[in-house]
Structure formats: structure tokens, C-alpha cells
């Protein structure tokens, strides 16, 4: 064997990890300016955030959404005596652009009036799950185009806030059945609605019963343990998981308390301040959805829930693209009997998309 042509050692065949070099000795390079570039681009394009609120009528869903974003996002439509109760679940959504300190947020809120209000609630979750999957399908149809937009409009539901009635007992069979299906399709954040109707002791006991029900029935709500990326995430998310479901109170009216204006509900016993942790846990819900985990909710939606849907849909496709802008996402037809001619299976024709990514909200 030629001594000059030695076989490489196992250690040398491995890809070495890149070293971190400091530029301070050679002068300023400007790498940190990338953050400024990203900030300018993000502020120009704005952000998209889509939430869904699910729960029975009268639990304060509309008020809670308005309290979260301190805007009249949704007008409450409590059915009166002369307004007939809808016979089927109907989904409604509204889109607003909220701007704060130059940052624009395109917020879409989907409401589910009629959920759980009927005598027979069998499969009342089908329209909700169908709507969630429909948004995944829309995004997929845009994504698989050969010529597609640089910025695909995102209508996927990033978070579903599930309002639990303040019964003080445990989760109902309807809640358990629906949550088992819902948590596999979207990020779910359960909350105890109208928590001011419970005492502090009743609220804590109710929370522990709900946590036990979720664990017993293998319902994994957001933030999921399996998605903690590092030690800091584990510490923060563990504290959040200990408090879920949050006991919340919504209010969209201001009152004077000790010379200051506060959001709250006025009762004959006093004023319930929604921003006061001694009164309710609304600040924890707001911080989770907006201040600390908004981008993480979007990332998990894209990388986990949408990815699972995309894999299933692409596995159903058994044909390659046959032309520009065309993708077959229909399942393959069954094999034709011997001696007969197989008819072509149905296919969905994807339209060409126009590039309008430069448009702002």
C-alpha cells in the first residue's frame, strides 16, 4: 500500500461543525444590520394572524376578542327572544388591520355561532374541522403552482381559543370529543369563560379537573411539550401549561378606579379589572397570543399541522404534473376490470396566480 495514499480516518470523514469567528479584531463588518433589514421588511409587509373562537353562546367570545386587541373587532350578536336560534352551525369571519407604533397586523377572527347550542350536537364539529382543512387546501393549491405568488395569502387558522363553560365540574363529553379531533388539526388554547362567576377556590379546583381530563384523554393543547426547542422554552412553556386553562374575564368598557382608567366589569360588589392578575388571568392569555408566542403559533401551524395535511394530500396524488400550472391532487381511480378501458380520474385544475406580493395591507 502506498504510504502517501492512506485511507482517511473516521474522524476526518465527518463534516466538521463551522467555527464561530469574531470580526472585532479586523474591524466592523455590519452583519448585525441584517436585523434592521428584516425589521424594515417586516414592518413594510405587516403580519397576518388568524384566530378562531369556539364555544357556546353567551360565554363572552366577542367581548374577549375586543379586549385582546383593544379594538371593536367583533360586534356581539346575542340572539334575543325574537331572533330564532340557527338550526345549523354557521361560521362567520371578519378581517381588520390593526396598527400600533408603525407595526401592522392583519387580524382575521372566525366565530362559530351555534356550536353546542342544539339539543342534538352530534358531529357539530364537522363544519369547524372542514373550515380549518379548507384553509389548508387553499394554501396548498397556491403552493403547488409551478408559477406561484411570492407571498401566498395565509388564511390558515393559527390558533383556536376554546371557551369552556364555568360549570365548576369537569369537561363535558362534547368538549372531550371535539378537543380530541381539534388538537390534531390546529393549536388549541382552552380558557375558562366568565371566570368571575366562580370563587378562587372553585376556579382552581375546576382547572385541575380540566387538566386531569385533558391528560386522561390524551388531548395535547398549546404549547405542546414535544415542540419545546430549548431549555428556555421548556421553562417558559412549563409555567404556561401549569396555568392552562386560563380563567379569563372580558370587558370593553373603562371605569375609574383610584384615579386611573381600567378595563373591567362593574358589579354591585365592585369592579373586576381584566388587567389585574388578582382578579383574572386575562394578561396571561394576552401575553401568550400576542407578546410571546404569536410567531411560534404561526410556525407550528406551518411546520406541523399544515405539513401533516400536505403529506396526506400529496400521498393521495398518483400522477405527475402534466402541464404548466397543473397539479393532480385527486386520488387514483380504482383499476379497471380486465377487457375494459379505464376512464381518466378526476383532477383539479389549479389556476395561474398573479404576483401581487408588493401590495401592502
Curated annotation (Swiss-Prot):
Pfam families: Septin (PF00735). Residues 45-316 form the Septin-type G domain. One of its GO terms (molecular function) is phosphatidylinositol binding. One of its GO terms (cellular component) is cell division site. The keyword Nucleotide-binding applies. Keywords: Cell cycle, Cell division, Cell projection, Cilium, Cytoplasm, Cytoskeleton, Differentiation, Flagellum, GTP-binding, Nucleotide-binding, Spermatogenesis. One of its GO terms (biological process) is cytoskeleton-dependent cytokinesis. Residues 45-318 are annotated as: Interaction with SEPTIN7. It comes from the Eukaryota. Residues 55-62 are annotated as: G1 motif. InterPro entries: G_SEPTIN_dom (IPR030379), P-loop_NTPase (IPR027417), Septin (IPR016491), Septin3 (IPR008114). It is found in: Cytoplasm; Cytoplasm, Cytoskeleton; Cytoplasm, Cytoskeleton, Spindle; Cell projection, Cilium, Flagellum. Residues 257-361 are annotated as: Self-association (via N-terminus) to polymerize octameric septin 12-7-6-2/4-2/4-6-7-12 filaments. GTP binds at residues 55-62, 88, 114, 194-202, 250, 265. Septins polymerize into heterooligomeric protein complexes that form filaments, and can associate with cellular membranes, actin filaments and microtubules. GTPase activity is required for filament formation. Interacts with SEPTIN6 and SEPTIN11. Component of a octameric complex consisting of SEPTIN12, SEPTIN7, SEPTIN6 and SEPTIN2 or SEPTIN4 in the order 12-7-6-2-2-6-7-12 or 12-7-6-4-4-6-7-12 and located in the sperm annulus; the octamer polymerizes into filaments via the SEPTIN12 N- and C-termini; the SEPTIN12:SEPTIN7 association is mediated by the GTP-binding domains. This is Septin-12.
Amino acid at each position: 500500500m502506498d504510504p502517501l495514499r492512506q485511507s482517511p480516518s473516521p474522524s476526518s470523514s465527518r463534516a466538521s461543525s463551522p467555527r464561530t469567528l469574531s470580526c472585532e479584531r479586523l474591524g466592523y463588518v455590519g452583519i448585525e444590520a441584517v436585523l434592521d433589514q428584516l425589521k424594515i421588511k417586516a414592518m413594510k409587509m405587516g403580519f397576518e394572524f388568524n384566530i378562531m373562537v369556539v364555544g357556546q353562546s353567551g360565554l363572552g367570545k366577542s367581548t374577549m376578542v375586543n379586549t385582546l386587541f383593544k379594538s371593536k373587532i367583533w360586534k356581539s350578536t346575542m340572539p334575543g327572544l325574537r331572533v330564532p336560534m340557527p338550526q345549523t352551525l354557521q361560521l362567520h369571519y371578519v378581517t381588520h388591520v390593526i396598527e400600533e407604533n408603525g407595526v401592522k397586523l392583519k387580524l382575521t377572527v372566525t366565530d362559530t355561532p351555534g356550536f353546542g347550542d342544539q339539543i342534538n350536537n352530534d358531529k357539530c364539529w364537522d363544519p369547524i374541522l372542514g373550515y380549518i382543512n379548507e384553509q389548508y387546501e387553499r394554501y396548498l393549491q397556491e403552493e403547488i403552482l409551478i408559477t406561484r405568488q411570492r407571498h401566498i395569502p395565509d388564511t390558515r387558522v393559527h390558533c383556536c381559543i376554546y371557551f369552556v363553560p364555568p360549570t365548576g365540574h369537569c369537561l363535558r363529553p362534547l368538549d372531550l370529543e371535539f378537543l380530541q379531533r381539534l388538537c390534531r388539526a390546529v393549536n388549541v388554547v382552552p380558557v375558562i369563560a366568565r371566570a368571575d362567576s366562580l370563587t378562587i377556590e372553585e376556579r382552581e379546583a375546576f382547572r385541575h379537573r380540566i387538566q386531569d381530563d385533558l391528560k386522561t384523554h390524551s388531548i395535547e393543547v398549546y404549547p405542546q411539550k414535544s415542540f419545546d426547542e430549548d431549555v428556555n422554552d421548556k421553562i417558559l412553556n412549563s409555567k404556561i401549561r401549569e396555568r392552562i386553562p386560563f380563567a379569563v374575564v372580558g370587558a370593553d368598557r373603562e371605569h375609574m378606579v383610584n384615579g386611573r382608567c381600567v378595563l373591567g366589569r362593574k358589579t354591585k360588589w365592585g369592579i373586576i379589572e381584566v388587567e389585574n392578575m388578582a382578579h383574572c388571568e386575562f394578561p396571561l392569555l394576552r401575553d401568550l397570543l400576542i407578546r410571546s408566542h404569536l410567531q411560534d403559533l404561526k410556525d407550528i401551524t406551518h411546520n406541523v399541522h399544515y405539513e401533516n395535511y400536505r403529506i396526506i394530500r400529496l400521498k393521495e396524488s398518483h400522477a405527475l404534473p402534466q402541464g404548466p400550472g397543473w397539479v393532480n391532487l385527486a386520488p387514483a381511480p380504482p383499476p379497471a376490470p380486465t377487457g375494459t378501458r379505464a376512464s381518466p380520474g378526476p383532477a383539479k385544475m389549479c389556476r395561474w396566480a398573479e404576483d401581487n406580493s408588493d401590495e401592502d395591507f
